[in-house]
A protein has these predicted regions:
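Cys-dependent protein tyrosine phosphatase-like superfamily
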Residues: 1-88, 92, 99-152
Length: 152
C-alpha cells in the first residue's frame, strides 16, 4: 500500500483477480506503452473498475525520459479520491510505478532521502529515475481541492 486507498503492483494476472477484488478497486492506472491485456480489461469491466492507461516509457539514459505530461495526468487521477481505491501498475511494478510514487512522496513532503530509500526497496538504484523524481515539476499536477485525499 502506498497510502490509504492507493496500491502498487506489477501487471495483474488471473491469479491475482481474487485478491484484487477484495480491494474494492474503483480504478486502475496502467503506466506502459504496451496495449492493456484483454483478459484484465474484461475482468475490470465485469468488476466495474475504470482503467486509465497512461503511455509512459521508462527512463533510459541518455536520451529517453518519461513524458512529464503523462506522469502529471496519472498523478491527477491517483490523487482524486473519487478514483480510490486505485491500483497503480506497470509491467513489473518497479521503475515507472516507483517514479510516480516518488512524485507522490514529494507531494506529501517526504524527505528526499526517505523517498529514494523507498524507491530503492522496490527497484534498486536507477540514477535516471532518481533524477526524474527530483526534478519533476509538481506544479504540473492538477489537484482538485474538493476531492484531494486527506493524507496528501
Amino acid at each position: 500500500m502506498v497510502a490509504p486507498g492507493v496500491y502498487r503492483s506489477g501487471h495483474p494476472n488471473e491469479r491475482n483477480f481474487g485478491f484484487l477484488k477484495r480491494l474494492n478497486l474503483k480504478s486502475i492506472i496502467y503506466l506502459a506503452n504496451d496495449d492493456y491485456r484483454e483478459n484484465v480489461v474484461q475482468w475490470a469491466n465485469r468488476e466495474g473498475i475504470r482503467i486509465f492507461h497512461h503511455r509512459v516509457t521508462m527512463n533510459k539514459e541518455p536520451f529517453t525520459e518519461m513524458d512529464e505530461d503523462e506522469v502529471a495526468s496519472a498523478l491527477t487521477h491517483i490523487l482524486d479520491e473519487r478514483h480510490l481505491p486505485v491500483l497503480i501498475h506497470c509491467n513489473k511494478g518497479k521503475y515507472r510505478v516507483g517514479c510516480v510514487v516518488g512524485c507522490i512522496r514529494r507531494l506529501q513532503r517526504w524527505s528526499h532521502i526517505s523517498l529514494l530509500e523507498e524507491y530503492a526497496r522496490f527497484a534498486g538504484e536507477k540514477m535516471s529515475d532518481e533524477e526524474f523524481i527530483e526534478r519533476f515539476d509538481l506544479s504540473r499536477v492538477k489537484l482538485d481541492p474538493v476531492h484531494c485525499p486527506s493524507w496528501l
